[in-house]
Amino acid sequence: MRKLFFLFLLVVTLLPTYAVRSFTLNLTPDGAAQLFAFLPDNPSGRAVVVLPGGGYVWLSMDNEGVDWAPFFNSKGIACFVLKYRMPKGDLNIPVGDAEHAMRMVRDSAQQWRINPYDVGIMGSSAGGHLASTLATHSSFEARPDFQILFYPVISMNERETHRGSVEGFLGTHKSDPEMVKLYSNDQQVRRHLTPPAIILMAHNDPVVPPITNGIAYYSAMQRQGVPCALYVYPSGWHGFGSQPSFTYHNQMISDLSTWLDKLPSHKPEQIRVACIGNSITDGFGIYMPEDNGYPAQLQKMLGEKFYVRNYGVSARTMNWQGRFPYMNEQAWRDALAFRPNIVIVKLGTNDANLVNWTKDHRVIKDQLEHDYQQMIDSLTALPTKPQIYLTFPIKIWNNSFGLNDSLLTTDIIPCIKKIAKKNKLPIIDMYKPFSENTDKSLYLSDGVHPNEKGCRKMAELVYDALKK
């Protein structure tokens, strides 16, 4: 199949541009899973993979699939409609088909004039559940860059969603509370990792209850600080899709079009900056960290030539012996897959928790050095050969959460100095400026986490280091 696909690509590449506007690809040898491609005359680089609904029993290929192609193409967006296979109790079948489609579009970015950093997903009804599953569960390579969800099935709890979709997707696992929770995607939204979304539905949908599905997903996105828009139209029932007969069709098209126009599009040529860290990087305790955390403020300072991503995860340690080691997180795997050009490593605060120093002191220090080196080795092995900056943690003013500032100064900061010297890496000193903030105006009330003003100070320190 792979050989046939690349042969097809060769043929497509050799044909005149005007001759190749739409085509079909088999994702499985028997053609049970197919990808219908519609390429725009004037591509913007953006692409969307469309997943029609049908309760995981059938597919509404026209109204929720190919009929959307003219709209997207008119905006310069490449449209790929997926005919995915029904799960029949094996959820890996449709998930695998959808992930295959996402990877194929990204892998073919050059041939199809697509920006691999701007490939979204759209799903309607059960297709919305499949789309949100990729957005919340898939690895970096198959995860979409944005979501468009029409009246989506989100919950896998039969009492609050479309029962047929639950039966089709989970099969015999529909009564397993762990599986129900795992694939109720409002419970799986991950800050900084789940992509932005727009959700569109009708108030009087009798098939997929809005409150426990689309609105629940919006609420989860808002709680996690992930950008999300919600449109609930007064009427329309379920399945209005692309139909012009939908009373609010023109308004819906305008809403979707405006959202797409305002959605940031990151480019391959941008300098990619990965901010690795704990809750201080994550933006714990501040309102909308996607807008106000230090990585977000750094993005504003650096401008459009840079693409800054926040890979902070609360409570994480550098030390593998800690309770929650950072390198065990999806965020770490994402940071590597991001192929950054610059990496800011701001870990160590949670390593100053006394519970992580219960073993022999020297053993812990040796382990910390080893784990810093492991992270650096993984980053330097990337094909982008990123410039790595190590940072001293900010001062801990209060022993909140069991943290101890003296461990920072006597053990962790000296360890960072040693590792930086060994690897000839620059250091960004965040400890000294924050230790001089005696009125704690840069901190939240816990004396550990920076407020918005403190996040701006952190961003300024990083910005100054990058501009040297």
Question: What is each model feature region?
Answer:
Residues P206-N213:
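Conserved alpha/beta-hydrolase "acid-adjacent" motif
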Residues H100-S165, V180, N185:
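Primarily recognizes the serine-hydrolase "nucleophile elbow" in alpha/beta-hydrolase
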Residues I198-D205:
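Short beta-strand/loop motif that positions the catalytic acidic residue
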Residues W68, H266-G312, A331-R339:
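Serine-esterase "nucleophile elbow" of acetyl-processing enzymes
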Residues F36, I215-K267, D446-V448, E452:
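C-terminal catalytic histidine-bearing segment of alpha/beta-hydrolase fold enzymes
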Residues G45-G53:
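Short beta-strand element of the alpha/beta-hydrolase
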Residues V180-K181, K300, E304, Y326-K468:
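Alpha-helical cap/lid subdomain in secreted, periplasmic
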Residues S60-D62, D67, F80-P116, P244-Q251:
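Catalytic nucleophile-loop/oxyanion-hole region of alpha/beta-hydrolase
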